[in-house]
Amino acid sequence: IKSSAASDVYKRQNLSLMEKLAILTDAAKYDVACTSSGADRRGDGRHMGNCLAPGVCHAFAADGRCISLLKILFTNECIFNCAYCQNNCNSDVPRASFTPDEICTLTMEFYRRNYIEGLFLSSGILISPNYTMDLIYQTLYRLRTVHHFNGYIHVKAIPGADPALIEKAGFLADRMSINLELPTANGLKQLAPCKSRHTILSPMRQIQNGITENQNELMVYRKAPKFVPAGQSTQMIIGATPENDYQIMRVSEALYEKFHLKRVFYSAFINVNGDSSLPVLPGGPPLLREHRLYQADWLLRYYRFHAVSYTHLTL
């Protein structure tokens, strides 16, 4: 049944690879685990360079290096109906899905042209979490073993997927992330009732434990395969639910302490659906608030501040 459903998806789309690329790079633009350049200068055939290579964005390595990544979704098909997401099952948007081989082709061709140094791969939920996570694993496996791609790979783990699939992907990826989506369980229940804190935090804990066990193993056997060597991260939408900045910082602090995350990303809420359950923000997306949260987050990560410290700061 799943195979038939997947076949129907691909037949319905009947799109070229470049058409899929245009749809699925645009669909990935709200994932802020890396930054886009913001430049819109297109190559004209007469001059060197092109600022509009689809889906090319930038992330920063632990040593400060800027890494160019191909940021795409595997699919923007989704069985979930998260109110804040432009790709939810009720949204009237163009749909597309890659195959594992298509992503391998794009990644290798972009790499050969020196557009990118790595891949950032996320996805909507096609048919089921297990089905989607298996497709992602197949993609990573082919990139690493068939195409011998040794570049950086950041992949999203799919909440609700079989832990065995997440583990296998973790031995092929450099970084994994699972979006927390919203700061509190109440917010998640209100705007994404198909998701739960349990299905998000369980794989986050699995990845944390896997990293710790792998680090211990590497101390004994240096040639042991590495599991998510660049660590894990997460993302929260800011402004879609009524939490204040102190509450958000408390959540981030707990994530850093309990799950040893490398990074928490904050995404200013943009109402892309006009859903009645979403707030109307007269001033538009809270971009300054997002910026201030990153500043506070920096104090958490690098200066060992605690969230409660912010309530006592005076000028």
Role assignments for model-derived ranges:
Residues 77-87:
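Local cysteine-cluster metal-coordination motifs and their immediate loop/turn environment
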Residues 7, 11-77:
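Flexible, acidic/Gly-rich N-terminal and inter-domain linker regions that tether
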Residues 184, 199-275, 285-308:
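Conserved C-terminal portion of the radical SAM core fold
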Residues 72-76, 173-175, 182, 270:
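Short glycine-enriched loops at secondary-structure junctions
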